Amino acid sequence: MVRNALAAAVLSALLSGPVLAQEASPPPPPPAPTDWRAISPSDLLVIDTSKGRILVELAPELAPAHVERIKLLAARGFYDNLAWHRVIDWFMAQTGDPLGTGDGQSWYPDLKGEFTFRRGPDMAFTPVAAPTGALIGFVRSVPVQTQPDDLMAGTGDKKVHGWGLYCPGVAGMARDEGNDTANSQFFLMRQAYPALDKRYTVWGRVVSGLDVVRALKASPTPDGIVTEPDRMTRVRLAADLPQAERPTVQMMNTTSAAFRALVDQARQAKGADFSVCDIDIPAQVTPGA
C-alpha cells in the first residue's frame, strides 16, 4: 500500500441408541477488578470523527519513533479536520494527509521503518499460541508474533525479533514505495489483512470505536479514494485533554485468569481455524465530557 494506492458447517450425529444430551459449557466467570489494567492517558489517542469517537492504545515498545511522531502531530493539532481520504471496505481506513489526496504529509522528515521490534525478557508479552518456531500473543492490546524465548540466550542483545500482526483495529503507518518514507499518514484496519505483516509499521490498536472505523464512508472504487469523506474533527492524547473531557480505558489484563478463559473460549469456538485475530480484548470505557 502506497499513499495513493487493503460458515462454519454444522454437523448432526445420529446415535443408534438413545440420544445423549450434552450440557453446554458454562460461560467463564465475570472478571474481578484485579483482572483489569488502566491505559495511561499518555498512551491513549483520542480520535474524534464525524462518525463518532475512536480510542487507540499506543505501543511505543513496537515502534517508538512512530508513536513519538503521532503524539507530536496530535499535540500540534495537525490531524484536526483531516479527511479519511482512502477507505476500502473489508480492508482499512486511511487518513493523515493535509492535502486530502494521498500525496501530502507533515513538515517533519520521513521516518525509518519500524516493521519489527526486539523483545527481551523484560517486555510484557502474553503468548496465546505456539506454532513451530514461534510465539503468538499480545504486547499490550496489540497482537504480535515473535521468536521463542529460548533463542534469547544465543543473541548478542539477549532479545528476539517480533512484529505486529494486522488484525482488525490495528493501527499502521502508511508510506510510499520506500521502506523509510512514513511521515504523517496512518490507517486503521477494518478487517484482518496479514499480507501487511512486517511490511508496514504497527504503532497501536483501536481499543474502542472499531464500529466507528467500519462506519467511515468507504469508496466504491478499487483505489479507495473517497469523495465527500468523513473527517477527524479533533485528535489529542488523553493526557492533553482537560480532566473533565478525558476518557479513561480499563483493558482486561492479558495475564489474568479471565483472559485465559476468554482465549480458551475463542479457541474452542474456532477449532482448527483459531487465530489471534479472533480474540477481542474487553475494554471498559468512561467517555469523559
Residue ranges and their predicted role:
Residues 21-289:
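Cyclophilin-like peptidyl-prolyl cis-trans isomerases
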Residues 7-17:
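Bacterial N-terminal signal peptides
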Residues 1-7:
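Bacterial N-terminal signal peptides that target proteins for export
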